[in-house]
């Protein structure tokens, strides 16, 4: 199995199936095909190209209904639910963040609660946090699902920053931590090498700092 980073918070995880997480706007949406798309919330930097895709899409109930009205094939879920699909288990877990679509008149259309995902595929358990602040129930994600990979936001301002991300990583206890939603824009610039050193000097966890188009190969 491999994890490819497409930038910002967009990842492609490919094993027995190809999963796409939070498809930010890309120059060529068709260049990143997937069997299943997972969207954590409705902000433009995460829902991105979902409208231009034809893969099955998982999203929270309200957002799923909105996408379905635009012709996207969807599976609606809510926090605490799970879906079995083609030998893959997808669980929807909490995130502390807003979720809305900005309309042409400048108002925002509510799209349900933001979420994260815990995905079991090919012997791995991956926690994709989506945009979120730190919350203590992350400890339950470790207790219930035991992820071996955690993909966590670390940019601050709109999500938790490096210090909170370090605490989240300790609570979740995954062997590998991949920071996201960081260093994309000036307002979310952080020192990721320092973040990596701080975690790896004090824990047994490994931090994988990925650049766009980097690929992490998993056994």
Curated annotation (Swiss-Prot):
Residue ranges of the TM segments: none
Protein's name according to its UniProt entry: UPF0173 metal-dependent hydrolase Mlab_1154
Family to which this protein belongs: Belongs to the UPF0173 family.
Organism: Methanocorpusculum labreanum (strain ATCC 43576 / DSM 4855 / Z)
PANTHER family, per database record: UPF0173 METAL-DEPENDENT HYDROLASE MJ1163, UPF0173 METAL-DEPENDENT HYDROLASE MJ1163-RELATED
InterPro entries, per the entry: Metallo-B-lactamas (IPR001279), RibonucZ/Hydroxyglut_hydro (IPR036866), UPF0173 (IPR022877), UPF0173_UPF0282_UlaG_hydrolase (IPR050114)
Top-rank taxon: Archaea
GO molecular function: hydrolase activity
Keyword match Hydrolase: yes
Gene3D superfamilies: Ribonuclease Z/Hydroxyacylglutathione hydrolase-like
Pfam families hit by this protein: Lactamase_B_3
Keywords: Hydrolase
């Amino acid at each position: 199995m491999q994890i490819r980073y497409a930038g910002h918070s967009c990842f492609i995880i490919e094993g027995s199936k190809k999963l796409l997480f939070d498809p930010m706007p890309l120059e060529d949406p068709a260049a990143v095909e997937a069997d299943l798309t997972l969207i954590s919330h409705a902000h433009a930097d995460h829902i991105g190209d979902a409208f231009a895709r034809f893969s099955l899409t998982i999203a929270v109930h309200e957002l799923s209904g909105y996408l379905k009205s635009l012709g996207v094939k969807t599976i609606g879920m809510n926090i605490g639910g799970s879906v079995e699909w083609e030998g893959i288990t997808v669980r929807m877990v909490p995130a502390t963040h807003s979720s809305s679509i900005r309309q042409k008149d400048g108002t925002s259309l509510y799209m349900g609660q933001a979420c994260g995902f815990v995905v079991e595929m090919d012997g791995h358990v991956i926690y994709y946090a989506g945009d979120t602040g730190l919350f203590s129930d992350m400890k339950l994600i470790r207790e219930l699902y035991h992820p071996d990979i955690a993909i966590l936001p670390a940019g601050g301002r709109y999500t938790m920053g490096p210090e909170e991300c370090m605490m989240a990583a300790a609570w979740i206890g995954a062997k590998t931590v991949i920071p996201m939603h960081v260093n994309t824009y000036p307002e979310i610039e952080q020192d990721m090498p320092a973040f990596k050193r701080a975690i790896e000097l004090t824990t047994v966890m490994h931090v994988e700092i990925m650049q766009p188009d980097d690929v992490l190969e998993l056994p």
